[in-house]
From Swiss-Prot:
Belongs to the elongation factor P family. It comes from Proteus mirabilis (strain HI4320). GO terms for cellular component: cytoplasm. SUPFAM superfamilies: Nucleic acid-binding proteins, Translation proteins SH3-like domain. This is Elongation factor P-like protein. GO terms for molecular function: translation elongation factor activity. InterPro entries: Elong-fact-P_C (IPR015365), NA-bd_OB-fold (IPR012340), Rib_uL2_dom2 (IPR014722), Transl_elong_fac_P/YeiP (IPR020599), Transl_elong_KOW-like (IPR013185), Transl_elong_p-like_YeiP (IPR011897), Transl_elong_P/YeiP_cen (IPR001059), Transl_elong_P/YeiP_CS (IPR013852). Pfam families: EFP, EFP_N, Elong-fact-P_C. One of its GO terms (biological process) is peptide biosynthetic process.
Length: 190
């Protein structure tokens, strides 16, 4: 059991007879005095894969579920199934393409360090990605010299097909760091 204001992204809760995995949290502070802060949470129903949105007050009590997290790395594709290998005991974890469609936009061909599989009682529930990923821009309009002073952006295509907004001074071939949850440009990659 935890209060709504203690819930973090990646946690799992049981609510309305559903197992829900927290994907995103928006905190809405009210302008009126005495009103409590609202937490708008976006979930994925672990059993059905549906997206669910709920609002909670900061002091609402939610039933949290303990999940097991296992570090994995991408192994291979078998038809429409993606296989990830446990980094310690080499157990394979299989996901159908439609289960991890969003996550695949952030996994480059060479793989991504920091991925975890979430399991509960031996059942595979979800694939969790790290906060950021470094990728190379494969297509964008040419960079404009001297554009670093303006805050204007342009679309850039990445190797996985993901398109995000980047500053105008970047060009094709530049490596950038992307915040996965917010799908936004963070800066140049090291």
């Amino acid at each position: 059991m935890a209060k709504a204001n203690e819930i973090k992204r990646g946690m799992a809760i049981s609510y309305n007879n559903k197992l829900l995995l927290v994907k995103d949290i928006d905190i809405q502070a009210p302008s009126a005095r005495g009103a409590s802060t609202l937490y708008k949470m976006r979930f994925t129903d672990i059993r059905t894969g549906q997206k669910v949105e709920e609002r909670f007050k900061g002091d609402d009590i939610l039933d949290t579920i303990n999940l097991t997290r296992r570090a994995v790395s991408f192994s291979y594709i078998d038809g429409d199934e993606y296989v990830f290998m446990d980094n310690e005991d080499y157990t394979p974890y299989t996901f159908k393409k439609d289960q991890i469609e969003e996550e695949l936009l952030f996994i480059p061909e060479e793989g991504l360090a920091g991925m975890q599989v979430l399991t509960m009682d031996g059942q595979v529930l979800a694939l969790e990605l790290p906060q950021t990923v470094d990728m190379e821009i494969i297509e964008t309009v040419p960079g404009i010299k001297g554009a670093s002073a303006s805050a204007r952006t342009k679309p850039a295509t990445l190797p996985t097909g993901l398109v995000i907004q980047v500053p105008e001074y970047l060009s094709t071939g530049d490596k950038i760091r992307i915040h996965i949850a917010e799908r936004r440009y963070m800066g140049r990659a090291d």
